[in-house]
Amino acid sequence: MTGRMLNKHPDIFTFNELHFYEQLWKQQDQTKKINQFEAIALLNTLFSTQRDGYFHRKADEKYSSESERLITNLNGPSFFAHEIYKAFIEYEVNKHEKKIGCEQTPRNVYYVDAILNHFSNPLFIHIVRDPRDVLLSQKNRWKRRKFSGNTVPFQQTVRQWINYHPITIGKLWLGANNKISLHKNKPYYYVFKYEDLLMNSEKEAKGICQFIGLSFHDEMTKIPNVGSSLKQDKPGQLGIDKSKIDGWKKGGLNKTEIFICQQICKTTMIENGYELEKVNPNLFLLLYYYCIFPVMGFMAVLFSFNRIKNIRETIKRRFFN
């Protein structure tokens, strides 16, 4: 939602989720160069992700001529992968006659240090949301295929269903939000609450613009209502949907899921102003969730092997760093 809002600004171009870091780049690539053919393949993949969509991306040769032209402007014959990524970002921003690129992949939160090293003066916008609403959203994420008009591949729907477990989602939320402590109060890092954006969209949008160094435009709050895991997409309906606040209170999560989430995230929740709900879990359901956790975790890793460059590094960054 924030990416679509920023894309309404005349100076900002919002990319699709490119998933460069983690899926196309690993830490070992920091010092490893690639040749021209590998660079073109990487660019083709990035072009495909942006032009065709993340679910249809591949190293499509239909973009080879464009990739080759871009490569000629770089100092070859070998390159670092992040140099290719940076060149692609700059190319697309200029192509759309914008000044600033917004790369909205959420997992970039695990690669802030790498991004700071790869780009000159990058800015980060970190959105904090009630983990119980995150849990509800992720639990229903597999329904995006239906709500988006079958634009999500069936295999992705299966993967999204497998990825859900209250322990996994709770730990991911905690890991991502604990990253705030590493960069809080730094001039390049801006944090706001998702709920504040919904309740007072213009005020929060102005705060984001001030952080970036741009003026606010009224059109920024007139965004299409799409992308929800709980509702049918309504691209013709513009504005901020305030009904997303406290969605977990309206049903969709059982008491045991809420209990697990709060047990994992409670300290960080309190620090961010989220009140804990008094709930008594179902002990049999609690035991069930803990028993199936290793199985669901293994299946989630299995379904991610062909998507992530270094699964060991990814698990370490998400859960242990």
Regions found by a protein language model. Give the residues of each.
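A conserved segment at the C-terminal end of the G1
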Residues: M1-I12
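Hydrophobic/aromatic beta-strand patches that form the interior of the parallel beta-sheet core
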Residues: F13, L123-I125, Y190-F192
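Catalytic beta-strand/loop signature of glycosyltransferases that borders the donor
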Residues: F15-L18, D218-M220
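Histidine-centered beta-alpha loop that forms part of the nucleotide-sugar donor binding/catalytic region
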Residues: E17, P106, R129
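PAPS-dependent sulfation machinery
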Residues: E17-E103, R145-V158, I162
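PAPS-dependent sulfotransferases, especially Golgi type II membrane carbohydrate sulfotransferases
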Residues: K139-S148, N177, S181-K184, Q210-N321
